Amino acid sequence: MRAMVMDAAGRPLVARDIPMPEPEAGEVRLRIEACGICRTDLHVLDGDLAGPKLPLVLGHEIVGRIEATGAGVTAMSAGQRVGVPWLGSTCGRCRHCLRGAENLCDAPVFTGYTRDGGFAEYCVADARFVFPLPDGGDPVALAPLLCAGLIGYRALKLAGPAERIGLWGFGAAAHILCQ
């Protein structure tokens, strides 16, 4: 399959043929319809975030359709449209995971950083961390919702029934939240 691969920080991505990923137990493989480009992707590429797996396929705003499922995946099936976000999986055992704050996990896996992401024709993802998406939606419009959209939604949910909220800065998350 074709992918845009990062070999080192500060160097351009390279179009390359790489092996088709196979889903392991608990994973799904999807054919990618769209993948957004987030500022975080640029931070990884520029070397601002240390420690990415190399070589690496960037991209964590992924929209695609499931083509294959690994053992134990029963809630999703081939042909289903799903989204894959930055948080690719968590340990489920640390104090943060146990209290429902998976975003603070002690041993997270990040899509397009510590595992290959969506700047490719296909990717694999942990089935517990993908979101069902509507069949009729535009994949290009849906992709940013898997990063900035989730951040904005979480902020609004944490605000509770407040009549007013403050927005610090006005990036993609705030823009989507206001819509």
Which functions belong to the PLM regions below?
Residues 19-20, 53-59, 111-115, 121:
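Short Gly/Pro-enriched turn/cap motifs at secondary-structure boundaries
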Residues 40-43:
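Cytochrome P450 core scaffold surrounding the K-helix E-X-X-R motif
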Residues 82, 135-179:
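Mid-domain Rossmann-like dinucleotide-binding core that forms the NAD(H)/NADP(H) cofactor-binding site
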Residues 21-35, 46-95, 129, 134-137:
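Glycine-rich beta-strand-centered segment in the early N-terminal region that forms part
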Residues 10-15, 47-49, 113:
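Short gly/ser/thr-rich secondary-structure transition/capping motifs
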Residues 75-76, 87-131:
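Cysteine-cluster motifs in flexible loop/terminal segments that predominantly coordinate metals
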